[in-house]
């Protein structure tokens, strides 16, 4: 299926996140590449069968295992990051000048979702992409990553080295978006596997609606 067809809505009109829209093709292509790595990580975690495992992995294990590269590419073209790294928790990304407050927040326990070795590399990839967007396209970071304004400010004004060090020390921050909404993921994976464009588009739109609802609930937009 061509990228041109993939950028069309169910009615045959260009989607709001198509390369012709305000976000631009390079930003969206990079997002798709990051998402593909995120999906590969989820597939690997599901195959690992670690215990205790989250319902997102156990209930959808067959879908994760059967998700081939073509299906992953289709699912990866969602116009939002499929994982999160605490981009609505500004205290995690606060400057070193406020280290005491930041360290207290960072000390709060966060259960690691990912236990496979690949998680650290994906965490670095996600945070590097987040830093790039926050420092050059703050509005895009907030839309595509569900990032709060204060997080965008902290990450966008920090050095890449500082953000990378935080990421290396806190790989457990990396979590699936909507990890407790198994049906949302079931819909995305099944439609990506089928390749049915209209159904896949509806799944993407549902994700956008959820992201917007989360933003309103957190007052981050």
Q: How should these model regions be labeled?
A:
Residues 99-108:
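Short, charge-rich amphipathic alpha-helices with coiled-coil/heptad character
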